[in-house]
Amino acid sequence: MLLEQLRRAADERQARALTRRRRIAHTACAPHQAVGPVDAPAPQPLLTFCSNDYMGLASHPDVVAALADGARLYGAGSGASHLVSGHSLAHARLEEELARWFAPHIPQARTLYFCTGYMANMAVLTALGTAGATLFCETLNHASLIDGARLARADVQRYPHCDAAALDALLAASTSPLKLIVTDSVFSMDGDVAPLAELLALAERHDAWIIVDDAHGFGVLGDDGHGVLQALGLNSERFIYIGTLGKAAGVAGAFVAAHETIIEHLVNTARPYIYTTAAPPAVAHALMASLAIIEGEEGRQRRANLNQLIADLRAGLAPLAAAAGWELGDSATAVQPLIVGDNAVSLALSARLEAEGIRVGAIRPPTVPEGTARLRITLSATHTAADVQRLVGVLADAVPPEAKREAA
């Protein structure tokens, strides 16, 4: 019975062009990467626009060397959870450095390191979203925030995308003793940024707290790459900030930055933190090298290059999208969605690009709402202007000739 049910579900996914398949990367994460299907005899060299390595640090020699040094110092694994014997000097130093970064934005800030961003989000929402609390969740939040809200014992209310007025009304009507606003900062499939200054004003008006997942902003936004709070110049003890260390930081893991009382509560009550083996100390050691690059002059240069590439890509894609009846999302970040609507069209465009040696993922429901299938184009600071021109050129060839004539 189980196998029959699963086969029917697989057939339904296939009929709706929703089947997902893994690919194998044969070389390091970089704009130019050798990739192949699981059963391919040899990988294909591809220009990739689908990783989240926004700062190009996953293959940075300093970070790679630090990872090796960390393994020599601390071994391959931690051996236990943080509360048993797995909390190493490398973990402690990483948390101290991140606390320094967030001291200007969260009074009495401390940080807590997690193995993954998913675990960090689950930990925060389940530890704070207890019975009697209410979570006010953005409709386009990441799946990990959605799942965390489902597992929390709190009441859950949803507000429309970036709609501060609707959130204001929900908060005003709530009698909950603990109100928690839950939002992405940079939305992972759209690239736009939550109105955090407005949300903070609402939090202060209604005595609420803000859980903000800055997975796609940390390392990229702000003069020093410290993320969305630095970029917007915000400071409040009401922020419970979650940053990812496997995207712009180029390694792995995540962290929570919050008032020290909140962090101490998580250490003692957050089950995803307590009941799992700590990440290898070598990873934390490598992240120290990554943070130094992000905050230093090289990081500033990389962010400047990334911002120029974003502008170049949007300038090239805007007329193509208009001609083809597609939508170029309103994004000023490294996540650039080209929304085509139909699932099959998104897959066909992705296949067309791959035939020309370019890899861009086709994103379909349930990851995005029905009717908004898209190419999710992501840029890295280590892409070049020529890389972007090549992508735009291939997409231009994919626009139907009749659409080009109508646009002309």
From Swiss-Prot:
Its cofactor is pyridoxal 5'-phosphate. It catalyses: 6-carboxyhexanoyl-[ACP] + L-alanine + H(+) = (8S)-8-amino-7-oxononanoate + holo-[ACP] + CO2. The keyword Transferase applies. The modification N6-(pyridoxal phosphate)lysine is found at residue 247. The keyword RNA-binding does not apply. GO terms for biological process: biotin biosynthetic process. Substrate binds at residues 20, 142, 367. Pyridoxal 5'-phosphate binds at residues 117-118, 188, 216, 244. Gene3D superfamilies: Aspartate Aminotransferase, domain 1, Type I PLP-dependent aspartate aminotransferase-like (Major domain). GO terms for molecular function: 8-amino-7-oxononanoate synthase activity; pyridoxal phosphate binding. Keywords: Biotin biosynthesis, Pyridoxal phosphate, Transferase. Coiled coil: none annotated. Pathway: Cofactor biosynthesis; biotin biosynthesis. It comes from the Bacteria. Its EC number is 2.3.1.47. Catalyzes the decarboxylative condensation of pimeloyl-[acyl-carrier protein] and L-alanine to produce 8-amino-7-oxononanoate (AON), [acyl-carrier protein], and carbon dioxide. Belongs to the class-II pyridoxal-phosphate-dependent aminotransferase family. BioF subfamily. Homodimer. This is 8-amino-7-oxononanoate synthase. The lineage of its organism: Bacteria, Pseudomonadati, Pseudomonadota, Betaproteobacteria, Burkholderiales. The gene is bioF.
